[in-house]
């Protein structure tokens, strides 16, 4: 019975041998071969599939079908056939993550996909492996400065991280990947683009190279918008539209990954995607922000002048013996610089990352922290989204961020890839406007709410806008003004 249900769900994932589509695929190198679901996956009992979806809180919404069309790939052994070397780096992993399991079959089948999941859930491989397989399957000769796949990321650090992960797989099958971002000279990037089939880039630099003729996006068959909500928050909406405009529509597969699902992100998806399947891991993404339940959250209410002394005490406790990696967040660049200097005078191995540092200095700080040369990284929110720094045992919020969403993103640097995490937040009276929202996050994750925090009140104050009031997030942003110059 389970097998029959599966056949109903898979639709055209198993075309007949007489299918003309198969013959056309051989002739047309611009089209990927169809996705064939593993026979071994066919034989998995439906009850086991249902349990997997339930245990991982996976919701799949497909407007073009009544039910999810394909079964999740719950084991690496169920991956579709490809160059065996492409999958070789997976030997270091036990099993796919929830977002990988749910999105892989859809992406391998060529569907447009919206993935909504917390950071640290394995999203890079979720879109990265199908990307590389598609490039292999197309079997087209690479043309200079005309990539087949583009991944757009909001920050340089995240772009570098995506690049590093993709290269581990791409180099096994001789696929060239280029990483493009601002803050460095363009000449080396132009040279890398000549042989790159896959380009990972930030919107600003990608648009620059596109505008000056260094890059032709007319052959792109696979487009990824990673951390889409973050890119829109940073004001890149028009840049993204300009970048996508010359890309082919009919033969392009578009993938969007996001941690939240506000109206502005939904509008972007409706503009550039074709009948997308939405895969949600966890609760309602449009609801209040929720923290990773594996993270132990501790909130300490302190006086503003006590914060730095308390930070030193916390670090002394966590840096004994085998020192833990600790990520300390500050709100402002000057504050981060001051805290970094303080910790260095106290004998801690510390590095910093914030907007005043050059690109090379930021690289060095991240590498020092990743390698263990520095065990404390002091950062502003530039590092709060997307960075996958392994084995961060503790996040300390020296100063509470401007929004509770940023709080959730900050503490998401720990407790990644299934590990447990720990976050300590130093909360002061100046942060009391955020107390209600923070209390809700703590309660939703079954964390202790200190009495001192409750005294600030549990009311959640809605964000206000001068023109739109409390409903500004649901209002379509106005079109940017055009500068008009009149003759004398």
From Swiss-Prot:
Domain of life according to the entry: Eukaryota
Recorded GO CC terms: nucleolus
Basic and acidic residues composition bias: residue spans: 1-29
GO MF annotation list: ATP binding; ATP hydrolysis activity; mRNA binding; RNA helicase activity
Family annotation (Gene3D superfamilies): P-loop containing nucleotide triphosphate hydrolases
Record's subcellular location: Nucleus, Nucleolus
The keyword Zinc is assigned to this record: no
Annotated Helicase ATP-binding domain residues: 104-279
Spans annotated as Disordered: 1-42
Keyword entries, A-Z: ATP-binding, Helicase, Hydrolase, Nucleotide-binding, Nucleus, Ribosome biogenesis, RNA-binding, rRNA processing
Binding site for ATP: 117-124
GO biological process: rRNA processing
Position of sequence motif DEAD box: 226-229
Coiled-coil blocks: none
EC number: 3.6.4.13
Reaction(s) this enzyme catalyzes, per UniProt: ATP + H2O = ADP + phosphate + H(+)
Entry keyword RNA-binding: yes
Broad enzyme group: hydrolase
Domain notes: The Q motif is unique to and characteristic of the DEAD box family of RNA helicases and controls ATP binding and hydrolysis.
Protein name according to UniProt: ATP-dependent RNA helicase dbp3
Organism whose genome encodes this protein: Emericella nidulans (strain FGSC A4 / ATCC 38163 / CBS 112.46 / NRRL 194 / M139)
């Amino acid at each position: 019975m389970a097998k029959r249900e599966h056949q109903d769900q898979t639709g055209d994932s198993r075309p007949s041998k007489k299918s003309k589509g198969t013959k056309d695929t051989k002739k047309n190198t611009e089209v990927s071969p169809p996705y064939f679901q593993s026979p071994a996956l066919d034989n998995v009992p439906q009850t086991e599939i249902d349990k997997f979806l339930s245990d991982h809180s996976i919701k799949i919404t497909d407007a073009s079908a009544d039910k999810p069309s394909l079964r999740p790939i719950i084991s690496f052994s169920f991956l579709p056939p490809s160059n065996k070397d492409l999958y070789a780096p997976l030997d270091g992993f036990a099993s796919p993550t929830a977002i990988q399991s749910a999105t892989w079959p859809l992406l391998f089948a060529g569907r447009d996909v919206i993935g909504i999941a917390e950071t640290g859930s394995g999203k890079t491989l979720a879109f990265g492996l199908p990307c590389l397989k598609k490039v292999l399957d197309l079997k087209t000769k690479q043309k200079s400065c005309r990539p087949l796949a583009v991944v757009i990321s909001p920050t340089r650090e995240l772009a570098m991280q995506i690049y590093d992960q993709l290269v581990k797989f791409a180099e096994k099958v001789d696929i060239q990947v280029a990483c493009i971002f601002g803050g460095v000279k363009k000449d080396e990037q132009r040279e890398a683009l000549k042989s790159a089939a896959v380009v990972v880039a930030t919107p600003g630099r990608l648009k620059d190279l596109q505008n000056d003729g260094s890059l032709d996006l007319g052959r792109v068959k696979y487009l990824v918008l990673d951390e889409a909500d973050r890119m829109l928050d940073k004001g890149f909406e028009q840049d993204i539209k300009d970048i996508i405009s010359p890309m082919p529509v009919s033969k392009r597969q578009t993938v969007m990954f996001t941690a939240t699902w506000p109206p502005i992100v939904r509008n972007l998806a409706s503009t550039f995607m074709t009948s997308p399947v939405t895969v949600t891991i966890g609760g309602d993404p449009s609801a209040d922000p929720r923290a990773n339940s594996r993270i132990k959250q501790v909130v300490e209410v302190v006086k503003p002048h006590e914060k730095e002394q308390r930070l030193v005490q916390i670090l002394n406790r966590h840096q004994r013996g085998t020192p833990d990696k600790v990520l300390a967040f500050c709100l402002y660049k000057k504050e981060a610089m001051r805290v970094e200097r303080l910790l260095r005078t106290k004998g801690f191995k510390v590095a910093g990352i914030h907007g005043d540092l050059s690109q090379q200095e930021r690289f060095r700080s991240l590498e020092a922290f990743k390698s263990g040369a520095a065990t404390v990284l002091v950062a502003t929110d530039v590092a709060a989204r997307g960075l996958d720094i392994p084995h961060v045992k503790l996040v300390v919020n020296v100063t509470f961020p401007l929004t509770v969403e940023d709080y959730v993103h900050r503490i998401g640097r720990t407790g990644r890839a299934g590990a447990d995490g720990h976050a300590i937040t130093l909360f002061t009276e100046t942060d009391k406007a955020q107390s209600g929202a923070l209390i809700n996050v703590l309660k939703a994750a079954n964390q202790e709410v200190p009495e001192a925090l409750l005294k600030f009140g549990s009311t959640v104050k809605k964000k206000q806008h001068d023109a739109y009031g409390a409903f500004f997030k649901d209002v379509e942003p106005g079109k940017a003004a055009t500068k008009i110059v009149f003759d004398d």
